[in-house]
Amino acid sequence: MGQKIHPLGFRIGITQKHRSSWFASSKDYSVLLQEDHKIRSFIHGKLSNASIAKIEINRKADQVEVLIATARPGIVLGKSGAGIESLRNSLTLILDPNKQIRVNVVEISDPDSEATLVAEFITQQLEKRVAFRRAVRQAVQRAQRANTQGVKIQVSGRLNGAEIARSEWVREGRVPLQTLRADIDYCHRQAHTTYGVLGVKVWLFKGELLPDSKVVELAPSQDQINPDVS
């Protein structure tokens, strides 16, 4: 029986890069790993309506740099950067107070090309009791307008309140999961409805990277917002 590997982990070093970038001794590794989990959980909980696509964490000595990629930077930044300062102070309470924390925000210009945001859109629609086929169709149309070369969406659970759970999926275009050079974005989310939990999976195919192409890094650039706030 075939087994499905995680599309992002399968392509690390080829089309994907690690979301956490740091080195540690075997003694400190588990501590820093738990810190990363706490940082991501806290930010997603505090900014649940900010359309956050990804959070990258870089560590250098006693510095922790948190890079937030969001489609709604205004919610993260707050008025005059107050949101960033509040977030940084909250993270200081969670982590070692001796560590210097920097928070940078990068705006996502096309949210419909991010699997995380597409999956969140579908879960929000399902939780509002929108029919799953309509929610999936709208998500597929939005992804196609974002110039993705292929999209696949699967919804599992008690669809439309059916007594027997099942899975249904839709695919438009190409989604070559076994091609390592294919730039595949993937996300899994859960929708909590009155009938139970529905699982939502989204695959987006953004094209193939040539052998000489480098993994695109999410780093502060001209699109970065408020780089001096730390």
From Swiss-Prot:
Superkingdom assignment = Eukaryota
Residue intervals of the KH type-2 domain: 39-109
Q: Where in the cell is it found?
A: Plastid, Chloroplast
Residue ranges annotated as transmembrane are none
Q: Which UniProt keywords apply?
A: Chloroplast, Plastid, Ribonucleoprotein, Ribosomal protein, RNA-binding, rRNA-binding
- Does the record bear Ubl conjugation in its keywords? no
Q: Name one Pfam family in it.
A: KH_2
- PROSITE patterns the record matches: KH_TYPE_2, RIBOSOMAL_S3
Q: Which family does it belong to?
A: Belongs to the universal ribosomal protein uS3 family.
User: What HAMAP family does its record include?
Assistant: Ribosomal_uS3_B
Self-association and partners: Part of the 30S ribosomal subunit.
- NCBIfam families named among the record's database cross-references: rpsC_bact
Q: Give the protein's recorded name.
A: Small ribosomal subunit protein uS3c
Origin species: Porphyra purpurea (Red seaweed)
